[in-house]
Amino acid sequence: MSRLDSFITRMQAQRDGLNFLKDKVDGLPGPILEIGLGNGRSYDHLRQLFPGRDIYVFERKVAAHPDCIPPDDRLFTGDVQESLPRAARQLGQRAALVHTDLGTGEHEAHMAMGVWLGPSIDLLVGPGGYVYSNQPLAVARWEQLPNPPGVPADRYYLYRAR
């Protein structure tokens, strides 16, 4: 698969998965978390799906389109290994949805990231909350769910906290 095709597949998986989760998340209390702002596309999509909902964003260094940058009080900057525990102290374990699209472009490093990322996210996701991740995450209190329709296996992973 070309890099362009891979990018398009990833973007479709993001959109389709977030759209699939909209009705499920609407009935849950708590904020939405976007881990990895990048260019701000999925954050912008989350704002459209969940108007009026608190959306907190995590990004090492913001370089997104100006229209897609969250307000300062909803933005955690710096290394995500440090900002996730900081956010957990501030927000608690109550997120209704956590969407993460982090990666290094290198398979082994990407998989290693998932080892610490899952437990870090678990500090934030509330009971019954959803985690939609571009990497496999192993957390004991989460149940892995089937992927949303149209989302290829091993492209994204869907979990629900117990």
Regions found by a protein language model. Name each.
Residues E108-R162:
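C-terminal substrate-binding/active-site "lid" region of AdoMet-derived donor-dependent transferases
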Residues L28-G38:
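Conserved class I S-adenosyl-L-methionine
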Residues M1-G30:
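Class I SAM-dependent methyltransferase Rossmann-like catalytic core
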Residues P29, R94-A95:
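Local beta-strand N-terminus motif with an aromatic residue
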Residues G40-D44:
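Glycine-rich SAM-binding Motif I of class I
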Residues A95-M111:
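A short SAM/SAH-binding and catalytic strip from SAM-dependent methyltransferases
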Residues D54-E59:
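Conserved SAM-binding motif I beta-strand of class I
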Residues K61-G92:
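S-adenosyl-L-methionine
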